[in-house]
Amino acid sequence: MSTTEFPTTTKRLMGWGRTAPTVASVLSTSDPEVIVRAVTRAAEEGGRGVIARGLGRSYGDNAQNGGGLVIDMPALNRIHSIDSGTRLVDVDAGVSLDQLMKAALPHGLWVPVLPGTRQVTVGGAIGCDIHGKNHHSAGSFGNHVRSMELLTANGEVRHLTPAGPDSDLFWATVGGNGLTGIILRATIEMTPTETAYFIADGDVTGSLDETIAFHSDGSEANYTYSSAWFDAISKPPKLGRAAISRGSLAKLDQLPSKLQKDPLKFDAPQLLTLPDIFPNGLANKFTFMPIGELWYRKSGTYRNKVQNLTQFYHPLDMFGEWNRAYGSAGFLQYQFVVPTEAVEEFKSIIVDIQRSGHYSFLNVFKLFGPGNQAPLSFPIPGWNVCVDFPIKAGLHEFVTELDRRVLEFGGRLYTAKDSRTTAETFHAMYPRIDEWIRIRRSVDPDGVFASDMARRLQLL
């Protein structure tokens, strides 16, 4: 591709887990017409194709394209309109959820679905169909997209809606990891709010059985947001004990008078950026156990506590580049969900993780609600768990066995987190994958949109 017409830089790219790096040509532009011409040129030249990349917070290889072209989207970041009456925002795909939150809050609007970080673009949120603490009440991000402009392989920009004439392409793009085309712009329906704060309740459980029982008693319906940190290191009976945080956006009259003076103030500071100095091996059982014990004891039980966005939702966003704490070898975030009825099988997986010798401190437990229409959307009703394993010998073999178990129990892995499962396993986990591939090939028969993940999982 001509570097005169399309000035690119050669970069080594990897996911947030800092594993499986590859080198690609990267084009960054704020002009959507340049993106259209670059994709058209890539289609004409063949080769390794092109993929869009947002802020690089996917943990695996879905936004990498070794030997090909990567469109760096964050420069395309205009907010075109915010309508507090209809609750609709019209934004470029490179707008981050952090940027959108700051712009929308003065209008009394809240991002409808937030993952564990705000450092995600709108395009990435759609492409991965991200979910958050409110999945049981609001579903995933794609549920709130009212339209999008999708650049397809032939250079056409198509206007897509969830129930329009091209609804199959809309839903194939939701969760499609950028492989149906490049999302240039989207309209999102936001959530109305009176404040930028939460009213939160905290609870602790003493064992895995207690944690599961707590999430099975129906009380989740009383809260908009819910998730838990759980102990994956201690032996039974402490294994699976949890610090559970649940809450809803605060009403104005629920705030103390001091906060009522500026209830929509964006209150989520970043304290520091971690330097890249941490040695491999520092993240281990002996550092994780005391941190976990401190976190569990500090959490405690509380009611009706007013918390800001950082306290309730995004503690890790206080630390820029926090993934550096795992050292240059990186880490694997393993996220899976199994159906609600597979509860005994789910418990056996947690026991096996504890016994494996691969230890994780940053563990998330969430009971998902219903999924949506997207063939490759990750959430299904069931037990969802995220664990962060430092990279070390034997990990690949262990998680390969976990893959087998998750599949056997009717579960699946999340493309935004995966960088190593096989095509055979992935295809078996997603029963509608043939439907998705048919739709993708109908708009991109030559595989112009391609990524390291797409080649690994045979999605082209």
UniProtKB/Swiss-Prot annotation:
Disulfide bonds: none
Gene Ontology cellular-component annotations: membrane; periplasmic space
EC number in record: 1.1.98.3
PROSITE patterns assigned: FAD_PCMH (PS51387)
UniProt record, GO biological process: capsule polysaccharide biosynthetic process; cell wall organization; response to antibiotic
Listed result of changing C386G: 14-fold decrease in catalytic efficiency. Reduces BTZs to inert metabolites while avoiding covalent inactivation
Role, per record: Component of the DprE1-DprE2 complex that catalyzes the 2-step epimerization of decaprenyl-phospho-ribose (DPR) to decaprenyl-phospho-arabinose (DPA), a key precursor that serves as the arabinose donor required for the synthesis of cell-wall arabinans. DprE1 catalyzes the first step of epimerization, namely FAD-dependent oxidation of the C2' hydroxyl of DPR to yield the keto intermediate decaprenyl-phospho-2'-keto-D-arabinose (DPX).
Keywords, in A-Z order: Antibiotic resistance, Cell wall biogenesis/degradation, FAD, Flavoprotein, Nucleotide-binding, Oxidoreductase, Periplasm
Residues holding FAD: 52-62, 116, 121-124, 128-131, 183, 414
Gene null: resulting phenotype: Disruption of this gene is only possible in the presence of a plasmid-encoded copy of the gene. Curing of this 'rescue' plasmid from the bacterial population results in a cessation of growth, demonstrating gene essentiality.
UniProt cross-references to Pfam families, sorted A to Z: ALO (PF04030), FAD_binding_4 (PF01565)
Protein's recorded name: Decaprenylphosphoryl-beta-D-ribose oxidase
Top-rank EC class of the record's enzyme: oxidoreductase
Variant or mutagenesis effect after changing C386G: In strain: MN47; BTZ043-resistant
Organism: Mycolicibacterium smegmatis (strain ATCC 700084 / mc(2)155)
Activity regulation behaviour: Is inhibited by 8-nitro-benzothiazinones (BTZs) such as BTZ043; BTZs are a new class of antimycobacterial agents that block formation of both cell-wall lipoarabinomannan and arabinogalactan via inhibition of decaprenyl-phospho-arabinose (DPA) synthesis. BTZs are suicide inhibitors that act via covalent modification of DprE1; the essential nitro group of these compounds is reduced by DprE1 to a nitroso group, which then specifically reacts with Cys-386 of DprE1 to form an irreversible semimercaptal adduct.
